């Protein structure tokens, strides 16, 4: 393979990566590296594919090797920083992003990525500064806008935060659904609107506190939610028409229906949660009374305090490491007198002795099963998960163990969204130290 052929192959690899055809691109990359093992561009391609495949440790090695060949390449320093970011090595990531900015002070991606790492470290003021520097370089840099939103929202600057948050709709983390020729809802009254879920299950529950506000000012409200929430939302919002089809194609109920406007559920707060006093914090979900009776009968037969517990949450991108409790961590709970612990975790691989498990409820495809269980507990304690959102939304006493690095929604001294949720911060302590100091 001569140099001209190499350039042609690299163009083909680049085109395949743009089309996200990584499995086709990788054999070509291997072929190039066999003949040109020091080619920085091809090493970068390989690193990018590993990064997109959620294998940041492999990506890190390729980017580092590429930088040995091209130490003045600003994009490579940013890529190395991104790999460190995905590995939760945020201080190292920021160092590499700043190196990239040093090479080119007008490079928006360097500041934008730095702001993302600062957000993950809950350093809101610094994240805001970095995001604004990125936007000075490129006012349309979407990730910087999202990081700026997180910073504002963490500090309770609701109007500014929701304005930036709204710009992220349609991006990687907030999928936008379009049903016809309807417009995005601007909060106008007396309209027929469709509210759709756009993130995870916990996010749908979290933002659902705004649904009653939307119903109150609209002519008619349709809700297109996750199928697991359909029954729970139908009961909780009887004035709305609810369908659990947001992840489906060719949806029949849409035939013959015209909407005036659509709104992602995460877009509702910009209309209804604009200042501290606009958060009612009241319970807004209603569990199935018949399924509740089953759990009530069981728990009454125990004649003990029944506490729900969550010991794991999130993914490697959402601080799963910080949102994890071991048997040793929860040992103080296991020693509580006249108390039974019930797991609210799902897809449990290793059970903890002394904890009760009901997978037919927690792993159910119908979240009504989980909600009914939660509704009859005396309280819930654990790391932040969908179950904790559900618990607080049902009005159950909920203690949320907030890791040192946490999302913007847990940055307030108290949780404005749920008056039934108490935030307990880890700070620099171990989880066992935190739990040992809880007074039940």
Regions found by a protein language model. Give the residues of each.
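Alpha-helical solenoid repeat scaffolds of the TPR/TPR-like class and their adjacent stem/linker regions
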Residues: 1-379, 384-440
């Amino acid at each position: 393979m001569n140099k001209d052929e190499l350039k042609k192959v690299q163009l083909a690899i680049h085109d395949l990566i743009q089309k996200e055809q990584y499995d086709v691109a990788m054999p070509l990359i291997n072929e190039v590296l066999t003949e040109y093992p020091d080619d920085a561009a091809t090493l970068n391609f390989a690193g990018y594919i590993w990064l997109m495949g959620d294998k940041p440790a492999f990506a890190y090695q390729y980017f580092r090797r590429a930088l040995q060949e091209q130490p003045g390449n600003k994009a490579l320093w940013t890529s190395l920083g991104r790999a460190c970011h995905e590995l939760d090595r945020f201080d190292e990531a920021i160092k590499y992003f700043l190196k990239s900015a040093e090479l080119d002070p007008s490079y928006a991606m360097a500041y934008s990525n730095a702001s993302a790492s600062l957000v993950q470290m809950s350093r809101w003021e610094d994240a805001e500064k970095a995001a604004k520097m990125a936007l000075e370089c490129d006012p349309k840099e979407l990730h910087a806008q999202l990081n700026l939103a997180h910073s504002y929202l963490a500090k309770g600057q609701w109007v500014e935060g929701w304005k930036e948050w709204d710009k992220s709709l349609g991006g990687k983390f907030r999928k936008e659904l379009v049903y016809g020729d309807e417009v995005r809802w601007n909060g106008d009254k007396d309209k027929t609107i469709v509210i759709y879920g756009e993130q995870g299950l916990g996010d749908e529950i979290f933002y659902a506190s705004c649904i009653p506000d939307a119903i109150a000012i609209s002519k008619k409200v349709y809700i297109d939610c996750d199928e697991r929430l359909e029954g729970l939302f139908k009961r909780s919002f009887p004035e709305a028409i609810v369908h659990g089809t947001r992840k489906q194609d060719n949806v029949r109920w849409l035939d013959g229906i015209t909407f005036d406007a659509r709104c992602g559920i995460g877009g509702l707060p910009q209309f209804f949660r604009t200042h501290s006093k606009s958060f009612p914090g009241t319970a807004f979900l209603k569990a199935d009374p018949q399924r509740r009776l089953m759990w009530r009968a069981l728990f009454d037969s125990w004649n003990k305090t029944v506490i729900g517990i969550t010991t794991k949450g999130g993914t490697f991108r959402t601080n799963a490491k910080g949102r994890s409790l071991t048997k040793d961590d929860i040992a103080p709970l296991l020693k509580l007198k006249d108390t039974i612990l019930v797991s609210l975790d799902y897809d449990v691989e290793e059970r903890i002795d002394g904890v009760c498990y009901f997978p037919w409820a927690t792993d159910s495809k119908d979240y009504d099963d989980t909600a009914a269980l939660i509704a009859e507990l005396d309280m819930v304690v654990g790391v932040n998960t969908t179950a904790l959102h559900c618990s607080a939304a049902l009005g159950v006493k909920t203690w949320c163990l907030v890791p040192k690095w946490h999302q913007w929604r847990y940055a307030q001294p108290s949780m404005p969204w749920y008056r039934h949720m108490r935030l307990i911060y880890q700070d620099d302590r171990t989880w066992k130290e935190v739990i040992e100091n809880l007074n039940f």
